[in-house]
C-alpha cells in the first residue's frame, strides 16, 4: 500500500505498489487493511495514524523522528529511526551510482536558488510537476 497525490497515482503504481491511495481524497488510516511495515517520511500526525495501521509485531521505520519505547509497547510494534549522515565519501558514491546508471531519480522541477521560496511553497502543496524539486546554484 502506498499513498500519493491524484496526479501521481499512476507513477507510484509503476514503482510496484499494489494498492495506491489518493491522500487528497482518502485517509490511509480509513482502510481496513493493516500492514507489516510503515516507512514514515512525514512524522507528526501522519506517524501517529501510521501506528494504528500496523499489525501487531509490525515495524515502523521513520526518517523523521524516533518512536518512544512506551509508544512501541502500547501498539505492540517495533520501530527504527533511520538517519543517514551526509559525508563527502557518501555523496561521491551516490554520484558514481548515478553516473553509472545504477541509480536514478525523476526530476520534476529545476529552479534557480533565487526561487527558493517557490520551492518551499511547492513542498507545502503548491502545484508542481511529479518528481524531485531541485534548486540550481550558479557556479
Task: Describe each PLM feature range.
Residues 1-139:
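Terminal helix/beta-alpha structural elements that buttress the NAD(P)+-binding lobe
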